[in-house]
């Protein structure tokens, strides 16, 4: 009878049957070995990425950090167009949208008031569409006039 070999645990099971494999795979040692295997694999992938990035930088393939915000990464400014800085703390100019109305902050003196209930987003959506339907497409009318 063939034996089942577990690559993570580096061991043979007594025999190849679903119940033995299930028992083995739910065991603590097997789960720890699987976790260790993938942690090691992720560390190797991260190190490979670091090495490849370092080699590309040394070879001159990476010339500038795209997140640095230097002059080469910024889009060119159109000539003649100037956007004034925002007014910090000043009232908005006429025609500019202001801040939306914000309710006053609750303080400990407002003990008789309760916060508004939080709506469940799923409750506002309604029931899900039947399986096999395409979102946004109306289903055909089955019992319509003939």
Curated annotation (Swiss-Prot):
Record GO biological process: mRNA 5'-splice site recognition; spliceosomal snRNP assembly
Zinc finger (Matrin-type): 4-36
Main location: nucleus
Region ranges (Disordered): 64-96
Keyword match Zinc: yes
A GO MF term: mRNA binding
Transmembrane region(s): none
Composition skew (Pro residues), residue ranges: 73-96
Domain of life: Eukaryota
Entry GO CC: commitment complex; U1 snRNP; U2-type prespliceosome
Family: Belongs to the U1 small nuclear ribonucleoprotein C family.
Protein name stated in the entry: U1 small nuclear ribonucleoprotein C
Gene source species: Drosophila pseudoobscura pseudoobscura (Fruit fly)
Lineage start: Eukaryota, Metazoa, Ecdysozoa, Arthropoda, Hexapoda
